[in-house]
Amino acid sequence: MRVGIPTEIKNNENRVAATPAGVHELVRRGHEVLVEAGAGLGSRVSDDDFRRAGALVVDGPDEVWRESELVLKVKEPIEAEYPRMRRDQVLFTYLHLAASRPCTDALLAAGTTSIAYETVQLDDRRLPLLSPMSEVAGRLSITVGAYHLMSAVGGRGTLLGGVPGTPKAKVVVIGGGTAGEHAAANALGMGADVTIVDLSLPRLAQLENRFQGAIQTRASSAYEIAAQLADADLVIGSVLIPGAKAPKLVTDEMVATMKPGSVLVDIAIDQGGCFEGSRPTTHDDPVFPVHRSVYYCVANMPGAVPETSTRALTNATLPYALALADRGWRAALAADPALARGLSTHDGRVTNAAVAAAFDLPAVPVESLLG
């Protein structure tokens, strides 16, 4: 199969969909890999690195998209890429379609078979292709939150861990999944006072055990979230409903009660955000004010640490990319229920129930396409 890897063109998206090691494995199995010139530079991977791995490096995105049967990307296509998508092509990438009607409509109009990393789901409900980037985003959320708490950039001037004789910053993590767990771990490591809020009592018990009582946990409710926000310095929103838009758990009314210069980081912004006032921002212009607080809503946080993120992403996605290339998408999905759950669109139809519900569209059962 001919596999294409275009350069990511979303703002400050420096990741690339495969490392030279991943390309080498595809080539070793008899596939032809086309890589757009410069695609790996943001991840410290040169064109020569890809050539040595066996890739054909081509100038510009048009040839990559035109000649490839399987396109591997990192982020969802943006408007400039819509005309390049086509019906006889498989797109394997993060999509977050429930938060983007334009991208959904473009995929349906093109008839592209799209498979979303973030909805590939194992029988135990784990999300193997989302988890590594959730780990990165969770850890980064504390790094960027701590930075924006500095008074020089508009924050309240609080050091997360304080120093002897001063109070620690209070960090509230809403959502105790992978991103929330890693945010809590990083905040705790920096000496902060950490509270995790989640709906699942069994998950809260797991987190208390994992952190050996060093964090506080609270059962989620609107009342509890409002109470926690009232004296929080840094709030991390890490709520996830696989494939669906994130629920708005933090209202503007709650934010109005927060300390001046407090910071809110919305990791869920890829899925529409879990704060009422959230809107996507970029690494170039990452924050905006809401009442007296600072919102950070960058939709591709792991793109800021591409050398780490690209390696972690390829480690997770490569086995599935190999299956798609080796067997073709129908056979690969028929053989692997986890991969089948990632199918989002095919031949102008939506196949993910959460995406269909978000836009009041009919959903075609994946099973009906694999028989």
Protein language model annotation of sequence segments:
Residues E118-L159, I269, C274-G371:
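Adenosine-phosphate binding glycine-rich loop
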Residues N209-R292:
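Rossmann-like adenosine-cofactor binding region
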Residues R2-A110:
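An N-terminal-biased, well-structured beta-alpha scaffold segment characteristic
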Residues E69, K75-E76, L95-H96, S221, ...:
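Short glycine-/small-residue-rich Rossmann-like dinucleotide-binding loops
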